[in-house]
């Protein structure tokens, strides 16, 4: 459910970017390399680039969903159950697309599954972080291409003439934090042999909140 909710949120952002791409396709802006003006471009191209980036990000999310949408029921502590379970039936009843056929792998795959999902979340966060950076930069007096609304900016306690892009700066920081998630999970599960270990419990602390953080 969490993965699907993220996918729906990404799809909504994608459609916003596509609409803006069409709306501003004839509005010129400089194209930059090395932060120096290089060639003519347009805001339509800029919006469209982020829309296409999200399409690629969704491929990672779809792959991660496919890998974790497998029924582990029947693996018990990792070595099978003495109960006569019909694993095919439980897979159908629980709505899984497939099952973990090897009971040891069903348990041993913990950490790997979370890392795959975390990598997909991190790629989405990377796209949004870059978008937020551009918004901050283009809003500055040195560029002045966009004017952020008042509810996305704050003033300064000692410099009242300023409009600081706090919302986009916080978005950038939170997305950069999310990009560290795969590494955190990898290091928690690093050097663990097969079998269950309490180390895996710590993954939940960093993994589960990430969905809401990205949706926010």
Residue ranges: model-predicted function:
Residues 1-39, 98-113, 192-200:
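Long, non-coiled-coil amphipathic alpha-helical linker/lever segments
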Residues 1-6, 158-168, 197-205:
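Short, charged, low-complexity loops and linkers
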Residues 40-191, 208, 212:
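Internal glycine-rich alpha/beta core junctions
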Residues 178, 197-216:
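C-terminal catalytic subdomain
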């Amino acid at each position: 459910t969490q993965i699907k909710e993220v996918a729906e949120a990404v799809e909504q952002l994608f459609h916003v970017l596509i609409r803006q791409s069409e709306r501003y396709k004839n509005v010129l802006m400089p194209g930059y390399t090395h932060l120096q003006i290089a060639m003519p471009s347009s805001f339509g191209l800029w919006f469209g680039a982020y829309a296409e980036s999200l399409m690629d990000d969704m491929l990672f999310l779809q792959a991660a969903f496919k890998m974790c949408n497998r029924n582990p029921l029947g693996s018990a502590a990792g070595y099978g159950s003495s109960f006569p379970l019909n694993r095919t039936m439980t897979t159908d009843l629980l709505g899984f697309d497939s099952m973990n056929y090897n009971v040891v792998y069903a348990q041993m795959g913990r950490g790997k599954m979370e890392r795959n999902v975390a990598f997909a979340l991190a790629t989405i966060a990377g796209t949004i972080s870059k978008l937020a950076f551009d918004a901050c930069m283009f809003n500055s007096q040195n560029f002045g291409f966009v004017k952020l609304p008042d509810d996305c900016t704050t003033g300064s306690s000692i410099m009242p003439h300023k409009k600081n892009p706090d919302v986009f700066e916080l978005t950038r920081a939170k997305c950069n934090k999310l990009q560290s998630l795969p590494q955190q999970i990898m290091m928690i599960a690093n050097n663990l042999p097969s079998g269950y270990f309490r180390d895996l419990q710590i993954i939940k602390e960093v993994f589960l909140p990430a969905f809401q953080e990205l949706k926010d």
